[in-house]
């Protein structure tokens, strides 16, 4: 491409999910509702865990961190998407775009690490139940959460720095509802070889490493569960992992489909749809998945609601 067509852009134009005017109001209403459910549901999980002393154990400490990550993850993209739906310009500044990319990557990877830590918690609880409190001490839990945050920020810094090295053409329209890595790479005038290489190597190690750790944890859990003599006992033990497995399947399935494939085969339209699933739908469903399948959370929630009812209607 002729170098005269290259430019240092000051802003990008986010085209959003749809360019059809008649779809804008329904999209705004649907995503506003999902965002409200996500924020309220995850805040309820955090508040419940903080207010119930019996839930101050590693499993629920990690769950509250997952809920906080989900709030931040969705808040990185949805408010801006709702704004541009009715904006005549649909503009995001260059700096704002890089910041959005940074925090999106950071919270996506943080969720990845927290899901791996939660799998380790289930492994210790089922495979070493008598040593659970000795192994998963409060200090170890804090260290693991801090490590999740630190590694997530380092990962985000690397990929955001590489995006910042790209040069963009005069056409600065991003066919997406946020500054997604692949969408930005698609409109770059310069080679994205290093970006793609890092996604498929360092990125793959981060994501696949966590997924392999989760798989190994559940392989050990299954071996222990199979030794339980009664079918009822096996089901009761393994059912404690059902919520986590559901979230893992949705999160890694959609994430792998979007990012771990050649850039040439990346479909913007399909990418937008799949991205909505793991950036909006999954964080919205997580509180319901964990609360509906968890007796402690359901019991704590009912007690919390009872206290609220007594407080407001006494």
Swiss-Prot record:
Its main location: membrane. Disulfide bonds join 97-189. Keywords: Cell membrane, Disulfide bond, G-protein coupled receptor, Glycoprotein, Membrane, Olfaction, Receptor, Sensory transduction, Transducer, Transmembrane, Transmembrane helix. It is found in: Cell membrane. Residues 1-25, 80-100, 159-195, 260-272 are extracellular. The keyword Disulfide bond applies. The chain crosses the membrane at residues 26-49, 58-79, 101-120, 140-158, 196-219, 237-259, 273-292. It comes from the Eukaryota. GO terms for molecular function: G protein-coupled receptor activity; olfactory receptor activity. Gene3D superfamilies: Rhodopsin 7-helix transmembrane proteins (1.20.1070.10). Pfam families: 7tm_4. The keyword Transmembrane helix applies. One of its GO terms (biological process) is signal transduction. Glycans are attached at residue 5. GO terms for cellular component: membrane; plasma membrane. Belongs to the G-protein coupled receptor 1 family. Odorant receptor. This is Olfactory receptor 1Q1. The lineage of its organism: Eukaryota, Metazoa, Chordata, Craniata, Vertebrata.
């Amino acid at each position: 491409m002729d170098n005269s067509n290259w430019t240092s852009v000051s802003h990008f134009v986010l085209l959003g999910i749809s360019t059809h005017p008649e779809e804008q109001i329904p999209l705004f209403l649907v995503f506003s509702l999902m965002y409200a459910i996500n924020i309220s549901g995850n805040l309820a999980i955090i508040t419940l865990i903080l207010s119930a002393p019996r839930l101050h154990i590693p499993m629920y400490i990690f769950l509250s961190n997952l809920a906080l990550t989900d709030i931040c993850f969705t808040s990185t993209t949805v408010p801006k998407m709702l704004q541009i739906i009715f904006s005549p310009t649909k503009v995001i500044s260059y700096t704002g775009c890089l910041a959005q990319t940074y925090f999106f990557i950071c919270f996506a990877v943080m969720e990845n690490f927290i899901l791996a830590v939660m799998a380790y918690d289930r492994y210790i609880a089922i495979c070493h139940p008598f040593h659970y409190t000795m192994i998963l001490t409060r200090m170890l839990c804090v260290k693991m959460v801090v490590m999740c945050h630190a590694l997530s920020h380092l990962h985000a810094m690397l990929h955001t720095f590489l995006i910042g090295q790209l040069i963009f053409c005069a056409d600065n329209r991003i066919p997406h509802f946020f500054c997604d890595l692949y969408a930005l790479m698609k409109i770059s005038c310069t080679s994205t070889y290093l970006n793609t290489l890092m996604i498929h190597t360092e990125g793959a190690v981060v994501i696949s490493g966590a997924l392999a750790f989760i798989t190994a944890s559940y392989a050990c859990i299954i071996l222990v569960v199979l030794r339980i003599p009664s079918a009822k006992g096996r089901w009761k033990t393994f059912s404690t992992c059902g919520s986590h497995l559901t979230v893992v399947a949705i999160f890694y399935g959609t994430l792998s489909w979007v990012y771990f494939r050649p850039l040439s085969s990346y479909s913007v339209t399909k990418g937008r749809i799949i991205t909505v699933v793991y950036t909006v739908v999954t964080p919205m469903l997580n509180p319901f998945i964990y609360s509906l399948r968890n007796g402690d959370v359901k019991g704590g929630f009912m007690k919390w609601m009872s206290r609220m009812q007594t407080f407001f209607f006494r």
